[in-house]
Amino acid sequence: MTNTTYRENISMSVSGDTHMERLRLDAPADALTRLFFIFGSPIAHVRAPVVWSTLMKRYSANALMLPADVDAERFDTALAGVKGMANVDGVIFTMPHKFAAMKHADVLSARARRIGSINLLRRRAGGSWEGDNVDGAGFVVGVRADGIRLQGAHVYLHGCGGVGRSIGWSLAMEDIARLTLFDLDATRAHALAEAIRQDSKVRIEVATKAGGPDMRETDLAINASPLGLNAGDALPFSVDRLPPHAVVADVIMDPRTTALLHAASAHGLKVHHGRNMMNHAMPVAASFFGLDDAFDWNGASVQG
């Protein structure tokens, strides 16, 4: 699909009139508008629709990003309906759908096959659908942009679900020294460890309790679980045993500063906010969706 599809310099012929009317930036959707959806449940905390919509409006892209609150029970039916709409070009998945979405892809990127979940699905020429997962790539780029050193790092990852699995696999492709995994569902942690061992020789440990056997050697501690979304949630792990140089990262975007990050800051530790992952994954996702030429990433701020 050409870039002009997404720009609002499209002219439309008005029935019964001879002049051409240029579509206004704030005009409602028209018959040429391309649609993208974000599937999640709950969806209220997800920042991506606001950020994508802001960019689409700023750069006059004739496209809409629509949030869809879809629970697991209705997921397959809802996604099948969306895929059946000819003017839908892509879908983004957040919790809890990243594993379930895989079977809806006709083609998977090599990265998605290794990770075992997807957060992006796009319509290809001919009508087939391709899945990819850019969460981990966005996290790694964001961490590096924040000045956090990964080479030789000891990393603790709390949560091995859809986003955790992507982050864990992506970190293992970097030159880290050790990766400790924990999930309340131990089978998910062991499954991620096994997937990583197929592609990396990094030292991997599966912890039997939150925080792992010894946090005193941890350089980067990451929460990739839902803990912190809701007020009153328990901390995913204690920051008390982390060394003074450690960095604490959270993938949760709203609230921006979670209880875990508050505790880490109070303990004098550097923190890394969840919105960094989205901000650095967006250019990759835009390219995947064919929108990269519609946005000026050099001049765009994607702060959510």
What is each stretch, according to the model?
Residues 173-178, 267-270:
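Conserved S-adenosyl-L-methionine
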Residues 29-30, 150-151, 175, 237-246:
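Short, conserved loop/helix-junction motifs that constitute active-site signature segments
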Residues 93-100, 162-163, 226-229, 254:
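Short glycine-rich anion-binding loops that position phosphate/pyrophosphate groups of nucleotides
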Residues 247, 251-304:
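Adenosine-phosphate binding glycine-rich loop
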Residues 16, 21-146:
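Phosphate/diphosphate ligand-binding glycine-rich loop within oxidoreductases
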Residues 203-272:
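Rossmann-like adenosine-cofactor binding region
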Residues 176-199:
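NAD(P)-binding Rossmann-fold cofactor-contacting core
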Residues 40, 133, 143, 148, ...:
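Glycine-rich adenosine-cofactor-binding loop
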